[in-house]
From Swiss-Prot:
Domain writeup: The U-box-like region is a truncated U-box domain. It is unknown whether it is functional or not.
Family (UniProt): Belongs to the NOSIP family.
One GO CC annotation: nucleoplasm
Pfam families associated with the record: zf-NOSIP (PF15906)
List of residues that carry Phosphoserine: 36, 107
Originating organism: Homo sapiens (Human)
Bilayer-spanning residue ranges: none
Source domain of life: Eukaryota
InterPro entries cross-referenced by the UniProt entry: NOSIP, Znf-NOSIP, Znf_RING/FYVE/PHD
Motif (Nuclear localization signal): 78-101
Record-given protein name: Nitric oxide synthase-interacting protein
């Protein structure tokens, strides 16, 4: 309620609209927004460049990428992993040298203490007729017992004086974790290899129109079997052997009966039918999540 008094016609009630506006301006709390059609990509656009694909490939999870964009992403991730691994190995070697130096210093302190004790030993003649020798103990050998009185001031907790140069806390380097060598998909987060990418061949609506002319149209491609137009409102699937794009209705009614690729004639398995991830139409009934969240720090009392 930091800006309640600064709003126009401020009243005694903190309204929902004021709360949402203050949350957006404060920088705290999780923000939710409902995505509109303008924020949803088309089904034939790359998930990285958000532009219509010229040489599309699809992952086993159904995410469509431009071949050049995804290969550049994989190459960049491999370089980043190599850089992180080099920094990790360097820090690991530095820590190993520090541990060896500490062990060497501890060993030297142990030897130095032993030599000091050896040089401080004084041999005294023992009189066998004294009571000390008969008892086998000396007053110097008696160890003090545990104290039952109040604790002394010397044993009180000593807080470090950080303003003294000798007691200034030392800033230590952040410990690096061993990076994973696996390249992950930028959308699903699952492991991704170049061999997992399947080429996709869209069937254009009009084969006489070039690629530039197709981009300006709202309906650009059709199903390779039924010739139905493809859009974000039409669930699609990619057949792995041929790379053809067909509708899910065609898959359920025609292809699953014989499990044969209608383009190449190859046998199909469930793994060969890749459901294409589409952006949706902007309506809630499209079956696509249209709610975006941004997590920010939470201010608690």
């Amino acid at each position: 309620m930091t800006r309640h008094g600064k709003n126009c016609t401020a009243g005694a009630v903190y309204t929902y609209h004021e709360k949402k506006k203050d949350t957006a301006a404060s920088g705290y709390g999780t923000q939710n927004i409902r995505l509109s059609r303008d924020a949803v990509k088309d089904f034939d656009c790359c998930c990285l460049s958000l532009q219509p694909c010229h040489d599309p490939v699809v992952t086993p999870d159904g995410y469509l990428y431009e071949r050049e964009a995804i290969l550049e992403y994989i190459l960049h991730q491999k370089k980043e992993i190599a850089r992180q691994m080099k920094a990790y190995e360097k820090q690991r070697g530095t820590r190993r040298e520090e541990q060896k130096e500490l062990q060497r210093a501890a060993s030297q302190d142990h030897v130095r203490g032993f030599l000091e004790k050896e040089s401080a030993i004084v041999s005294r003649p023992l009189n066998p007729f004294t009571a000390k020798a008969l008892s086998g103990t000396s007053p110097d050998d008696v160890q003090p017992g545990p104290s039952v009185g109040p604790p002394s001031k010397d044993k009180d907790k000593v807080l470090p004086s950080f303003w003294i140069p000798s007691l200034t806390p030392e800033a230590k380097a952040t410990k690096l974790e061993k990076p994973s060598r696996t390249v992950t998909c930028p959308m699903s987060g699952k492991p991704l290899r170049m061999s997992d990418l399947t080429p996709v061949h869209f069937t254009p609506l009009d084969s006489s129109v070039d690629r530039v002319g197709l981009i300006t149209r709202s309906e650009r491609y059709v199903c390779a079997v039924t010739r139905d137009s493809l859009s974000n409102a039409t669930p699609c699937a990619v057949l792995r052997p041929s790379g053809a794009v067909v509708t899910l209705e065609c898959v359920e009614k025609l292809i699953r009966k014989d499990m044969v690729d209608p383009v190449t004639g190859d046998k199909l398995t469930d793994r060969d039918i890749i459901v294409l991830q589409r952006g949706g139409t902007g309506f809630a009934g499209s079956g696509v999540k249209l709610q975006a969240e941004k997590s920010r720090p939470v201010m608690q009392a």
